[in-house]
């Protein structure tokens, strides 16, 4: 990524305002040459307790949009539903499925507890996406707004004794 242009570089060269907001594990070099904001700590993210929540990336987003003219691309790199600490991916108010696994040692939890913790993290992601859509709706008269959601990988929740996403696709459970 350091020596090769990617789509963000090309868009920026075409005068598209590009912003990468990160609440995950950095951009892995993808956002090296575009504006980058780190939301993995409470300095930028107002939604931190045991972990900084994805919803914090929406803080100040309308101000950013209001300060720009023309086309823009905003990347919100979520922590999302990454395991094994599913219970850290959502605040307690979003624990919609119980009993839930509250350990990173998934072998100590039942399949139901793991599934419930994961499902609660999905519930929180749904909330995050709904809030993002509400912000975009505010700009429909000024911009053609679009939300594109892309997951970076699937997740195994104990099927055939496999957890997380560490297996090659060829041998991953169906």
Feature names for model-found ranges:
Residues 1-174:
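Catalytic domains that recognize anionic headgroups
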């Amino acid at each position: 990524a350091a020596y090769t242009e990617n789509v963000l570089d090309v868009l920026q060269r075409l005068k598209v305002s590009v912003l990468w907001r990160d609440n995950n594990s950095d951009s892995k070099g993808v956002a090296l040459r575009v504006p980058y904001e780190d939301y993995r700590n409470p300095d930028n993210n107002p939604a931190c307790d045991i972990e900084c929540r994805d919803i914090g990336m929406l803080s100040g987003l309308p101000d950013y949009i209001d300060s720009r003219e023309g086309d823009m691309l905003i990347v919100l790199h979520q922590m999302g539903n990454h395991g094994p600490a599913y219970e850290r991916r959502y605040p307690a108010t979003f624990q919609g499925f119980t009993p839930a696994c509250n350990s990173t040692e998934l072998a100590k939890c039942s399949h139901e507890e793991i599934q419930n913790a994961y499902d609660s993290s999905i519930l929180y992601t749904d909330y995050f996406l709904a809030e993002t859509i509400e912000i975009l709706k505010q700009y429909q008269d000024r911009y053609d707004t679009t939300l594109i959601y892309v997951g970076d990988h699937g997740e195994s929740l104990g099927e055939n004794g496999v957890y997380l996403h560490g297996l090659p696709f060829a041998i991953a459970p169906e």
